[in-house]
Amino acid sequence: MVVTTATKPHPFSIENILKSASPKPQKPLFSYNALIAMAISQSPLKKLTLSEIYDFIIETFPYYRDNKKGWQNSIRHNLSLNKCFVKVPRHYNDPGKGNYWMLNPNSDEVFIGGKLRRRPGQNGGSLESYMHLKTRTSPYQRGDTVCKRDRVVYLSNSGAGNCQFYQPVPCSSPTAMLSRSSLIVQTSPTTLTIPHHPPQNYIQTLSPNVSPVRVGNQTSPRQSALPSSSLPLLPSPPSLPSKLSSPPLPSLSTNLPSPPLDTGDILLSPFLRQTVDSTSQNFLEHMIRIREQVQRSGHLALAQSRAVVYQPIPRKSL
């Protein structure tokens, strides 16, 4: 029995010399997605299985024939992760194994120059879409954009029926808008607040431009010169008498002097003077009587506490 052993070819054999002389195939510049799209688009049915895609790549590009490490896994990953490839189940009458892969007709990517590129003119690539985005930018950018602002209403001298509106004005920067808003705050009327205890000897004014005046001296506030930018104030309400008359009170049993009560100390603001009627006057008179009675009763109690009652001390018998 003769045993033959396989011998390795000599490194300087003819086969090795021919292999070294022939140029090695270069790796193609196409991406894996482009290779898959090329294989599917050149098939007659426009669909291929995974093994058929492998066969097309090996037959078309000899580089992948000799280097089978890694690229087949990359083909599988690109088929499952890329949205431009769609898996189509095999029909039950179709013999064979594996599903088919097709190109997605709704995909935004096309095969251009060996790479899958997005179609021009879609997804904001055109000039019209760019101009549309420019028009939707913030109103604070530089340009002739109009800042929309709510209208501000001021009351005029003729009453609430005639109102003065502030129209929107164009502004080109945030600083201009801030300056305009500050102007509105300066010229807007002051909010009227009614305190629980009015300040003594001076009336409550509607605006800092009106100087305070005693009620007993003048019946209406004296208005100072207004600047040209300020708005006219409301007409002054009708004046009221400086002092309220109260009926005489019954005398008490004590002869202690009571402090004088001057009803002129209770001052009214212009808003209150305009809204006071007969009912409120009666209420004020009633409150004045109560305060005077409380003051007199306090003086009586103070005098009784200070009074010394004389009681004779009995003498002890010696």
Swiss-Prot record:
SUPFAM superfamilies: Winged helix' DNA-binding domain. It is found in: Nucleus. Residues 193-258 are annotated as: Disordered. Residues 201-210 have a biased composition (Polar residues). Residues 220-233, 241-256 have a biased composition (Low complexity). One of its GO terms (cellular component) is nucleus. Pfam families: Forkhead. Residues 27-121 bind DNA. Keywords: Developmental protein, DNA-binding, Nucleus, Transcription, Transcription regulation. InterPro entries: Fork_head_dom, FOXG1, TF_fork_head_CS_2, WH-like_DNA-bd_sf, WH_DNA-bd_sf. Expressed in uncleaved zygotes with increasing intensity until the 8-cell stage. Confined to aboral region during 16-cell and 32-cell stage, afterwards found in ectodermal derivatives, in particular surrounding the blastopore and along the tentacular axis. Not expressed in the apical organ nor along the esophageal axis in mesodermal and endodermal derivatives. Expression subsides after hatching. One of its GO terms (biological process) is regulation of transcription by RNA polymerase II. GO terms for molecular function: DNA-binding transcription factor activity; sequence-specific double-stranded DNA binding. PANTHER family: FORKHEAD BOX PROTEIN G1. Probable transcription factor. This is Forkhead box protein G1. It comes from Mnemiopsis leidyi (Sea walnut). The gene is FOXG1.
